[in-house]
């Protein structure tokens, strides 16, 4: 938001609660699912544990779809309720519509990390998150400063960064299954 000035930074601050909800849905499903997975696995019920992982994955997919549609089509109303108006509403809407289209990346990016930890991959969970953060930072600079894509570029960098986290997590989880 800084390259756009005060309006860009204000937009990120007003829109962040929406992004936080997307990430918290993934984290909630991932944390709850990974705890149940560990309980079942510790009890010796490997089959049930794997079924629970599959169920949590489907739940993340379902919530991703619902959140994508809901946030995309109600973004202006949500932003208005959060206090956006005028230029902030316009910029926020531009930002959140991109974020909404990448909801699946946000939900899975945060939702798979707890499973990685419970598969014994705490280091890989950290690596996945660092890869996502680094990608976001590099692409923020590229999209916003170099290419001048503004809020659209900032949002695109965010969802691509989450996509990188998700990709590393998916590869790790697929190998461990």
Predicted regions, residues:
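Short alpha-helical transmembrane segments in multi-pass integral membrane proteins
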Residues: 37-104, 138, 146-177
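Recurrent gating helices in multi-pass secondary carriers
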Residues: 3, 68-72, 133
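Interfacial/gating helices of multi-pass transporter permease domains
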Residues: 1-20, 87-91, 151-154
């Amino acid at each position: 938001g800084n390259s756009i000035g005060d309006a860009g930074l204000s937009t990120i601050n007003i829109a962040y609660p929406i992004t936080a909800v997307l990430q918290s849905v993934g984290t909630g499903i991932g944390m709850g699912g990974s705890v149940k997975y560990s309980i079942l696995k510790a009890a010796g019920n490997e089959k049930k544990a794997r079924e629970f992982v599959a169920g949590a994955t489907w739940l993340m997919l379902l919530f991703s779809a619902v959140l994508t549609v809901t946030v995309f089509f109600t973004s202006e109303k949500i932003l208005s309720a959060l206090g956006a108006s005028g230029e902030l509403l316009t910029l926020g809407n531009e930002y959140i519509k991109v974020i909404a289209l990448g909801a699946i990346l946000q939900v899975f990016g945060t939702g798979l990390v707890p499973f990685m930890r419970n598969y014994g991959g705490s280091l890989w969970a950290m690596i996945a998150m660092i890869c996502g953060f680094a990608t976001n930072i590099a692409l923020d600079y590229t999209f916003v400063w170099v290419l001048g894509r503004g809020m659209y570029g900032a949002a695109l960098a965010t969802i691509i960064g989450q996509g990188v986290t998700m990709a590393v997590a998916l590869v790790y989880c697929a190998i461990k299954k």
